Curated annotation (Swiss-Prot):
This is Uncharacterized lipoprotein MPN_054. PROSITE patterns: PROKAR_LIPOPROTEIN (PS51257). It comes from Mycoplasma pneumoniae (strain ATCC 29342 / M129 / Subtype 1). It is a lipid-anchor. Keywords: Cell membrane, Lipoprotein, Membrane, Palmitate, Signal. It comes from the Bacteria.
Length: 123
């Protein structure tokens, strides 16, 4: 069940990538194989409804082909970060807060991606 929380940020940030067209075509083929729907990823990520449809399709794809889906999303995320499309400038500072007065459990709300990361800090 915890792996589900790991992949939510991957799904969300993979939507925002506009990396190389081979990644987009691989993603398109993967979604087409698993859901039977043919999406144009570059057009789909421009609307909020399209992003929701893409996330749902990726969830279905992960249920049937978890290794292939995770690998593709990690590659896309890496390329997006290397190209500077996902950067620290996009993340608003000051969003880190503690929960339940436990300094070892931090959450960071990232408004840019509209999601929360839960981080366990070990000293």
């Amino acid at each position: 069940m915890k792996i589900k929380y790991f992949f939510i940020p991957l799904f969300s940030s993979a939507i925002l990538f506009s990396a190389c067209s081979s990644i987009q075509s691989d993603l398109r083929n993967l979604i087409k194989e698993t859901t039977g729907k043919d999406f144009d990823v570059s057009k789909l990520i421009k609307t909020s409804e399209g992003r929701k449809n893409l996330i749902n399709s990726l969830k279905k794809s992960y249920e049937s082909k978890p290794d292939e889906t995770a690998s593709l999303l990690l590659i896309a995320w890496k390329q997006s970060a290397e190209m500077g499309e996902i950067g620290f400038d996009d993340i608003k500072e000051g969003g880190i807060y503690t929960r339940d007065n436990d300094p070892f459990k931090l959450e960071q709300k990232v408004e840019y991606f509209n999601m929360e990361y839960k981080i366990l800090v070990m000293f």
